């Protein structure tokens, strides 16, 4: 069970994005290639989940089809990278950081870890949006369909019965990961994915800041810490019905 879960998450969140990035994005940094590959895999997933919603197709069949399509593209990317890289391996570069930069990096990482621990161990979900998204993931898993049954009554529903919640694919993405890993979709959605979502959000934000500050590492790290503080303040002002990290976790959902 544990090995299956680890293999499933590594495949979906690491191996496939790496391979698809190498296949679809050339001449860019490894980080940008990985992010591009991951979003390409999400693009294919979004198309498939809408098609299977309309046709009332099987969640498990959609999962298999997604794995085959993305796996084939990733395999091609690794094959092309290996073929192109023979005899032309780049030298490893050593990155030197000042003491101030190390301190800023440590603070940024510590705040990320704090937010992950709070989300995984201490988050109370008390809002309609999150409850509906999570129940969509669970209902899809049990009914083997894509948002075609009410998570409240169990009744069969028509196409796009509630567009706001049906079009959002992240709950179904959680259900797909549940199919692959064997872990209940509510656990995937609320406990496991935030461990990925929070660092990913900050990696993307840090990349944007790095570009904005013309690769000035110190300014980039300072900007990232200010962004983390802003997220913390927004969380404190959210209204009292939940202690979720809205700007970091909930943005993935809808």
Language model regions located:
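Hydrophobic alpha-helical transmembrane segments
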Residues: 6, 35-39, 105-108, 222-226
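Hydrophobic membrane-spanning alpha-helices of multi-pass integral membrane proteins
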Residues: 37-50, 227-237, 254
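Loop-to-transmembrane boundary segments
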Residues: 97-110, 120
């Amino acid at each position: 069970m544990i090995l299956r879960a680890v293999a499933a998450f590594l495949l979906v969140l690491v191996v496939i994005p790496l391979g698809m990035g190498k296949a679809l994005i050339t001449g860019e940094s490894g980080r940008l290639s990985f992010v591009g590959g991951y979003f390409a895999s999400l693009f294919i997933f979004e198309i498939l989940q809408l098609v299977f919603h309309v046709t009332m197709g099987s969640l498990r069949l959609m999962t298999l089809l997604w794995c085959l399509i993305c796996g084939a593209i990733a395999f091609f990317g690794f094959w092309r990278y290996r073929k192109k890289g023979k005899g032309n391996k780049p030298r490893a570069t050593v990155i030197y950081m000042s003491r101030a930069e190390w301190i800023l990096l440590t603070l940024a990482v510590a705040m990320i870890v704090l937010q992950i621990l709070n989300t995984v161990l201490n988050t109370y979900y008390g809002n309609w949006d999150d409850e509906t998204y999570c129940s969509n993931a669970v209902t899809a898993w049990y009914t083997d369909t894509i948002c075609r049954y009410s998570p409240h009554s169990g009744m069969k529903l028509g196409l796009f019965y509630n567009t706001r919640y049906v079009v959002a694919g992240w709950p179904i993405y959680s259900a797909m990961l549940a199919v692959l890993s064997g872990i209940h979709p509510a656990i995937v959605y609320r406990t496991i994915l935030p461990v990925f979502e929070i660092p990913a959000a900050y990696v993307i934000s840090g990349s944007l800041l790095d570009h904005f500050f013309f690769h000035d590492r110190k300014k980039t790290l300072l900007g990232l810490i200010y962004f983390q503080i802003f997220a913390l303040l927004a969380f404190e002002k959210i209204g009292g019905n939940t202690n979720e990290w809205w700007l970091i976790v909930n943005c993935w959902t809808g």
